[in-house]
């Protein structure tokens, strides 16, 4: 089977193109696509590290270097949760809020561009197919034999 015969090939190629474009644009603002995504998902009332890890698809411990970098850049600060002192929440600094707005604007403009070139019916069909692929992936059991 050739890579072009698999669905995941096209998913990866399309996402890689999107991520590369976001990185190219984000670098002009001194951030990366991943940092922009994290900034967009940090809420005014703070966001738990575990929530961010889930969104990024990584373990909480894997985020420590990225969060440290974001602190050093002055984008975020950490604070123990008032209700559960064992839990740490991430908050945006004023500079982080500025960069979050930039990231949101970049995403909005890029999606406006895509929507100008992809019709409503095509977009809805794509979303439906991607949702179906996601569900099938979650349901898939390869049934390995030992």
Q: Can you name each region flagged by the protein language model?
A:
Residues 1, 121-146:
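C-terminal regulatory/oligomerization modules of transcriptional regulators
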Residues 1-29:
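N-terminal leader segment of winged-helix/HTH proteins
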Residues 9, 13, 37, 125-128, ...:
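Amphipathic alpha-helical interaction segments
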Residues 15, 40-44, 104, 131:
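Short, locally clustered residues in the helix-turn-helix/winged-helix DNA-binding domain
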Residues 19, 69-128:
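Charged, amphipathic alpha-helical coiled-coil/dimerization segments
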Residues 20-62:
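N-terminal helix-turn-helix DNA-binding core of bacterial DNA-binding proteins
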